[in-house]
């Protein structure tokens, strides 16, 4: 897989996760986060097991235990995300979730891995764009939902870094399948403690079942498997840079499907400017022109040539 192909795959994941806020909003507010995780991850595992049945015999040993580690991190991420999204607007949730672009470089610095010059240039543009697209205002009260989303964001940053190490040495497909299995098992055990009747305690509606299936297929089965493959050919910061375009995708979806997002979601000039800044930042951080000595030399020589022509 080339770098361009990897970026396309990662952007498709961003599209899935951005649209997932729409379907999470359609779930009952009182639906337990553990029930949500059990059903979406369990259904995702069933889908993957059917499609890749022949590969299941290789799901053992180190791959199985590494997928369990990933599952534990994902469980924390999904629980906090579910608690956060149910309490704050979709645009705010998308903004806070995109702050992974800040936490990943910080954690990498702790691991003595420095971001590139392009990363340093692009991240401020992305952060400025995130503030404008989210509509977050200075002095606004800090809601509990925001704190939940920050916690989810931190665990997502840890997940991206850990996946980067695991996928370089193990089969991404098996890691993804094992992760879905472990998440479903862990979530079900926690749900069993919270509500012994589990599935029998729920009130099922067509809207809820449709949302669960779409979340399981796109935001779980597809997104996590493709994330595994994408990270095999990309570094953690590149992954989070592409993921930071999520608010732009969410904003576009809000324009296309306004009734689903509600009347509070509106398009403004500030959001347009914010979206442009995010795209500029993503392009800067996702390329390497500042570290490309040949390109910089050509630009310098080109500039000197133009000055020489003007002087003559």
Where are the model-predicted features located?
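C-terminal-most transmembrane helix of multi-pass membrane proteins
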Residues: 8, 39-42, 208, 244-312
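C-terminal transmembrane-helix exit sites in multi-pass transporters
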Residues: 47-56, 100-121, 248-272
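Transmembrane alpha-helices of multi-pass small-molecule transport proteins
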Residues: 16, 28-76, 103-107, 125, ...
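Hydrophobic transmembrane alpha-helices of multi-pass small-molecule transport proteins
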Residues: 48, 115-135, 187, 255, ...
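Helix-helix packing/entry segments at the starts of transmembrane helices
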Residues: 36-39, 79, 93-99, 163-185, ...
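Juxtamembrane helix-loop-helix junctions in multi-pass membrane proteins
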Residues: 15-44, 83, 89-92, 158-183, ...
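Glycine-/small-residue-enriched transmembrane alpha-helix faces in small-molecule transporters
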Residues: 1-35, 72, 80, 139-165, ...
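Specific transmembrane alpha-helical segments of multi-pass solute transporters/efflux pumps
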Residues: 20-21, 52-97, 130-133, 216-234
